[in-house]
């Protein structure tokens, strides 16, 4: 436990931020899981809509500083490859 007043405040804000980040990351993972399910079912129209939603959430993660630019770029690339391979 921290003894310094400022460190106690920082610990509180860090915990609040951590909880927001965990919640946000969970919503991104859910969107990607839905996209993967649409890809498995070979439903291209639904997959394109979900791809757009996933892109939106990943880009929002960059602006919120939850994800790095390279992480998002890699995931977007991999997801688009999967969607483009649907026949």
UniProtKB/Swiss-Prot annotation:
GO terms for molecular function: small ribosomal subunit rRNA binding; structural constituent of ribosome. InterPro entries: Ribosomal_bS20, Ribosomal_bS20_sf. Residues 7-20 have a biased composition (Basic residues). Pfam families: Ribosomal_S20p. One of its GO terms (cellular component) is cytosol. It comes from the Bacteria. One of its GO terms (biological process) is translation. The keyword Cell inner membrane does not apply. Binds directly to 16S ribosomal RNA. HAMAP family: Ribosomal_bS20. Belongs to the bacterial ribosomal protein bS20 family. This is Small ribosomal subunit protein bS20. It comes from Phytoplasma mali (strain AT). The gene is rpsT.
